């Protein structure tokens, strides 16, 4: 069964910024996001023990230099995308979501 995707404003902003600076990376990140519809817990995903998003356990996957942070609502089959962070940025930024 396919999951729906729900994008936070921060994710939209990051995708827009990537579109202005690096179309190739934008495409790679967006394809990784789309793949979460079929498999929200791919083998390269990692559960984030210190982070919840809208009451759900957080996960992350990596695409190139970017970390895609999200949560999964199994009841409604929705992948809730919280942030896209460059690998150089600290996960402490997630405390401000």
Region spans (language model):
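A short, surface-exposed loop/turn module that caps and links secondary-structure elements
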Residues: 34-62
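Active-site micro-motifs of SAM-dependent methyltransferase domains
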Residues: 13, 35, 86-89
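Short acidic/His/Gly/Ser-rich catalytic and metal-binding motifs that mark active-site loops
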Residues: 4, 42, 91
């Amino acid at each position: 069964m396919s999951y729906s995707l729900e994008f936070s404003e921060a994710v939209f902003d990051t995708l827009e910024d990537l579109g202005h600076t690096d179309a190739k990376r934008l495409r790679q990140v967006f394809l990784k996001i789309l793949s979460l519809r079929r498999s929200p817990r791919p083998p390269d995903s990692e559960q984030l023990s210190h982070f919840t998003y809208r009451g759900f356990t957080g996960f992350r996957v990596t695409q190139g230099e970017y970390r895609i942070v999200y949560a999964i609502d199994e009841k409604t089959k929705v992948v809730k995308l919280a942030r896209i962070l460059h690998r150089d940025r600290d996960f402490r930024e997630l405390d401000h979501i």
